[in-house]
């Protein structure tokens, strides 16, 4: 009888942990989507040729994806479209898709590479670079195929997007390490 009671208690504790984990991820998704939108709006360097802009929301997408995984990363990425809906509406649909895919890719690749290499820094770096390159290619294709910008005009934004990715990488990886030192329990996410 005692074994059944212990098993029931363990099942209840696991159910509570799962519920808390799901609730925590939902909250983290909402918070990061809002933070990405705010960072995208507050720290802006316009690119007049394309009506696009350089911003620091990228960094928060990477942090969300690295710490909480692909789904939180995707939702955080989609948060950037909130900013575009306010300041560059023509980019909002593309941003929703491009940044959501970017956040998902970073979180997904980080988990997969980390499982094989055991190196958090290498895994994070590769994941961010691949996700960032998806963002660069995604905006280039969106501007040429959807917005109808000439190839040369869309190409003007490529270096800005690469710098945005690199700044995000240089900031996000150390921040991830710092957060994991303070909250080591987050390592269970990956």
Question: Language model features by range: what are they?
Answer:
Residues 1-190:
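Loop-helix junctions at membrane interfaces
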């Amino acid at each position: 009888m005692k074994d059944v009671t212990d098993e029931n208690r363990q099942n209840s504790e696991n159910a509570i942990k799962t519920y808390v984990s799901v609730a925590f991820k939902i909250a983290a998704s909402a918070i990061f989507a809002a933070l990405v939108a705010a960072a995208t709006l507050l720290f802006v360097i316009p690119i007049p040729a394309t009506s696009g802009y350089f911003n620091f929301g990228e960094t928060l997408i990477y942090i969300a994806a690295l710490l909480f995984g692909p789904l939180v990363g995707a939702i955080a990425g989609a948060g950037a479209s909130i900013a575009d809906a306010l300041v560059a509406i023509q980019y909002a649909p593309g941003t929703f898709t491009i940044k959501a895919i970017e956040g998902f890719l970073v979180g997904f690749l980080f988990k997969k590479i980390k499982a094989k290499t055991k190196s958090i820094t290498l895994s994070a770096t590769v994941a961010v670079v691949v996700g960032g390159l998806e963002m660069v290619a995604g905006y280039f294709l969106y501007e040429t195929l959807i917005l109808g910008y000439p190839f040369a005009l869309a190409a003007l934004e490529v270096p800005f997007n690469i710098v945005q990715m690199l700044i995000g990488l240089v900031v996000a990886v150390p921040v991830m390490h710092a957060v994991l030192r303070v909250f080591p329990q987050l390592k269970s996410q990956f």
